[in-house]
Design a protein with these regions (language model features):
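Hydrophobic transmembrane alpha-helices and immediately adjacent juxtamembrane helices
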Residues: 1-260
């Protein structure tokens, strides 16, 4: 019964999103064009770096291209639904619309994570997938290698998703959080496309444990070239989920409405 309810909720949200996409389909093609321009500029930057040095923070030119593809995939997946939905939920804490979700008998976290769906960022996912597949084929293929990367990528995205829910829970308790999500998304867009080891150690710690950009992008991309990353990602994912669930339960118990 619960699974059927989830499917009905997802179908209703998907239907509304598809209707919105059709009404603003020109925006999708513009997003694809802009994503292509951004990707071209990033590849040009990587070519410039590769022409000056063969290795950057331990990453070869091929590895940097693969990292860029992973960055596009993660950024697109997060911005399709989770990022705009959690931002909208935190806004709803102030205007009262979040109470409708919290009073709903359905799965709250599911509704929060899919309340807003934007199809424009799918262009990032498509372009990123194209880059990673091309790099995989150029590296000689290998289904086991690809499967290892896909699992690592899923764990990395799951860790970042749990972090978004953690911020949403903290937003309920402190009546803040929107600015944190916006800043984190900017970090994801700008810093995530470069190797984590390129930064100073204090910033590496921040990008791993405070805003898990490294765990979502650099570590999964590195797992394509080196094995042994899945254990780290599995532990980080489990820890992030437990922390997010604990924070969310505390937030729900302490929340008394938008007028507080």
């Amino acid at each position: 019964m619960r699974i059927r309810y989830l499917i009905r909720c997802f179908s209703a949200l998907l239907k509304m999103s598809v209707t919105r996409l059709w009404a603003y389909r020109t925006d999708f093609w513009m997003s694809l064009l802009l994503s292509g321009i951004t990707l071209s500029a990033d590849l040009l930057g990587l070519w410039f770096v590769a022409s000056r040095t063969s290795v950057l923070a331990g990453w070869s030119a091929q590895g940097l291209v693969f990292l860029l593809g992973t960055h596009f995939i993660v950024l697109g997946v997060i911005e399709v639904a989770l990022y705009p939905s959690t931002v909208r939920f935190i806004e709803g804490i102030h205007d009262g619309s979040a109470d409708l979700i919290l009073l709903n008998p359905g799965p709250r976290l599911f509704l929060i994570g899919l309340s807003e769906v934007a199809f424009g960022p799918l262009t990032h996912v498509l372009l990123g997938a194209g880059i990673t597949i091309a790099t995989w084929l150029n590296a000689g293929g290998g289904l086991l290698r690809l499967a290892h990367y896909v699992v690592a990528l899923a764990l990395g995205i799951g860790t970042l998703a749990a972090w978004c829910y953690l911020i949403a829970g903290l937003g309920m308790m402190m009546r803040r959080g929107k600015g944190v999500l916006i800043v984190a998304n900017q970090i994801l867009e700008t810093v995530g496309r470069w190797p984590l080891g390129l930064h100073a150690l204090p910033l590496q710690i921040v990008l791993t444990f405070v805003v898990p950009v490294g765990l979502a992008i650099t570590v999964p991309a590195n797992s394509f070239f080196e094995s042994g990353q899945l254990a780290l990602l599995a532990v980080s994912f489990a820890g992030s989920v437990l922390l997010a669930i604990g924070t969310w339960r505390m937030a729900v118990r302490s929340y008394i409405g938008a007028q507080s």
